[in-house]
Amino acid sequence: MAYNPKILQKPKEGEEITIKDNKLHVPNHPIIPFIEGDGIGSDITPAMIKVVDSAVQKAYKGEKKIAWYEVFVGEKCYQKFKDYKELSPEEQWLLPDTIEAINHYKVSIKGPLTTPIGEGFRSLNVALRQKMDLYVCLRPVRWYGSPSPVKEPQKVDMVIFRENSEDIYAGIEWQEGSAEAKKLIHFLQNELKVKKIRFPESSGIGVKPISKEGTERLVRKAIEYAIDNDKPSVTFVHKGNIMKYTEGAFMKWGYALAQKEFNAQVIDKGPWCSLKNPKNGKEIIIKDMIADAFLQQILLRPSEYSVIATMNLNGDYISDALAAMVGGIGIAPGANLNDTVGMFEATHGTAPKYAGLDKVNPGSIILSAEMMLRHMGWVEAADLIVSAMEKAIKSKKVTYDFARLMDGAKEVKCSEFASVMIENM
């Protein structure tokens, strides 16, 4: 299918990334859509582009170059397109051309987004994921030398596969007192004989869908990642001890998939199991842990965990808790993926009070771009960014959030930190 935008201009240069035989085929001048983002997006996204262009130039000496293509979602989108009568109020914030571009060009990157205030609008980040069925939220967490509240942050090296399309984040909920809430509570009490709603007259109510298909496709991706990246274990994190038919089912379906598709063998009497990595013969342990115990274990024994597969709400808590251990969400990268599309993103918010001050840490979106380059197979450029980040932090020329926690640090602006990274390539 050709990309035929109704409002945006087509890209003026570059070539399309394609998929053949389930593999990404990346030309030397790929078109990469980017969403600048709201608030501090105007600070961090140009810094990221500068770092990425420098890494690509240094790694490939001009042979490869990204053709950046700006697309629009959020406040900037609304300000640009609010007078377009052919767009609905929702489309003025979430441009249909943008969805089409992200789907068509396969790989994209975005800054943080403002969610519009008012009825009918939920998170734009969630809307993007749901519209394109980007069912994996991928959050790698490792230490780059930044200030940390824990004694041994270097022991943290995990990759979280968070299910993106289900759980209570599906947004199936109704306000207390609404006709829908009353109707559903009445149905539960009278048809299904539910007696556990403590205050039925004053309850808002929500639904938590967890499916076998949703679980299997997430767990499959997590195990494939462990195989491809030589990881020692995959841990299912859940609250199946309390929610047996949703989170408990997630765990059971996960183990069943590992056994059925990857020939995992039960250890002792289970449920843990083990499979051989077909690429190198090493053992990969498939295990599970209750979510609250896991949040303790990542502090006490982080080196025992590698790839994590979990549902939406747990994944949100876990990825931010882990990020805090290695320097905070200011440098936590992330991506949203399905079987063909990868959308990489800054994982923090818009921080409007810092917008335009050239002050904040651009690390999150820069490291998300590093993930993007690796996803594209441009490993040499990605490696340059990782080493430049480590060297920049070691040099103590850092943005204010790190400078205030480091002895002898020199505080630099957002754009200057990008320059420090480039000097360290």
From Swiss-Prot:
It catalyses: D-threo-isocitrate + NADP(+) = 2-oxoglutarate + CO2 + NADPH. D-threo-isocitrate binds at residues 123, 125, 129, 139, 162. GO terms for molecular function: isocitrate dehydrogenase (NADP+) activity; magnesium ion binding; NAD binding. The record marks 169, 239 as: Critical for catalysis. One of its GO terms (biological process) is tricarboxylic acid cycle. The keyword Lipid biosynthesis does not apply. SUPFAM superfamilies: Isocitrate/Isopropylmalate dehydrogenase-like. Its EC number is 1.1.1.42. NADP(+) binds at residues 114, 348-354, 361, 400, 404. Its cofactor is Mg(2+); Mn(2+). Keywords: Glyoxylate bypass, Magnesium, Manganese, Metal-binding, NADP, Oxidoreductase, Tricarboxylic acid cycle. Transmembrane segments: none annotated. Binds 1 Mg(2+) or Mn(2+) ion per subunit. Mg(2+) binds at residue 316. Disulfide bonds: none annotated. PANTHER family: ISOCITRATE DEHYDROGENASE [NADP]. Catalyzes the oxidative decarboxylation of isocitrate to 2-oxoglutarate and carbon dioxide with the concomitant reduction of NADP(+). Homodimer. Belongs to the isocitrate and isopropylmalate dehydrogenases family. This is Isocitrate dehydrogenase [NADP]. It comes from Helicobacter pylori (strain ATCC 700392 / 26695). The lineage of its organism: Bacteria, Pseudomonadati, Campylobacterota, Epsilonproteobacteria, Campylobacterales.
